[in-house]
Every structure is written in C-alpha cells, then in structure tokens.
Swiss-Prot record:
Name of the molecule in the record: LYR motif-containing protein 2
Gene Ontology CC terms, in alphabetical order: mitochondrion
Organism: Homo sapiens (Human)
One GO BP annotation of this record: mitochondrial respiratory chain complex I assembly
Annotated organelle transit peptide span: 1-19
Alphabetic keyword roster: Mitochondrion, Transit peptide
Record gene name: LYRM2
Length: 88
C-alpha cells in the first residue's frame, strides 16, 4: 500500500465541513453579542460563548458535534429574539 501524501493531521471532507459550521456559528454568536446594549452583559455573554466553545474544543464524536451545533443555533436564535424584543 502506498503511503499517503497527506499529513496525518489532515481533516476529512466531513470534518472540514463541520469545522466550518462551528466557526460560522461562533462568528455569528459574537456578532450578535456585539448588539447587546449593556457593557457588562455583553462581556458576560462573550466570556460565556468563548468558554463554551473552548470547553467543547476536543469533541470528536460526529453526533455530539452535530448536536452541539444544533443547540448553539437554537441559543443564537433565542439571543436574537431577546435582542429584538429589547429594541422594540
């Protein structure tokens, strides 16, 4: 069997796509948090988001990662709804 040309740490296509989904979710959460009017609330939410992503950084199980992305999207939508209500 021929040796692979790819380095051992190369992501599969599925892993690459999941990583992009996670990074997009992270960016969207931070962008939404920037809209929070109160400085202390904004800092708390930013620290919370960073800690959650940092804590789950080592997850490798496909189903677990998919579930966390779904939960993150639901929390993002909840934050967006809360901000919309606060502005109205």
């Amino acid at each position: 069997m021929a040796a692979s040309r790819l380095p051992p740490a190369t992501l599969t296509l599925k892993q690459f796509v999941r990583r992009q989904q996670v990074l997009l979710l992270y960016r969207r959460i931070l962008q939404t948090i920037r809209q929070v009017p109160n400085d202390s609330d904004r800092k708390y939410l930013k620290d919370w988001a960073r800690e959650e992503f940092r804590r789950n950084k080592s997850a490798t199980e496909e189903d677990t990662i998919r579930m966390m992305i779904t939960q993150g999207n639901m929390q993002l939508k909840e934050l967006e709804k809360t901000l919309a209500l606060a502005k109205s």
